[in-house]
Amino acid sequence: MRLWHEALIEKLPRAQLLGQHRECCALRGKGWAKKHSMVNYVFNYSPYKLFQYHLEVMNEMKIRGYHPDESWFDPLYRGQKCEAYLELKKITQTLPIYPEHNESYLESCRENLKEKGIII
């Protein structure tokens, strides 16, 4: 499980883009705060940041003709098996959304994709 550097979202092949959507759904739902070495940093921030990242993924999906469930466009939604947030303070989006998504992380993501035979 990993969140690709946001600069790569629009360049990701279909499988990685759709996989990213699934991972965001899992993290926003019952996966919230469950330890995983590659994504632990997201739990240091408001869940609203994950919503912002997920929104980038879903907007790219829509550009490509996919139809993510509209429920996920609600920042309070956490999936069918998890209670929605009652309240979640809206925060201004930063660039990058997560400070961990720096140049070093971008290169790490590119290397990971390259190992899968994907050159971006």
PLM features: residue spans?
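Expand to "…catalyze enediolate/carbanion chemistry for C-C bond making/breaking, isomerization
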Residues: 1-120
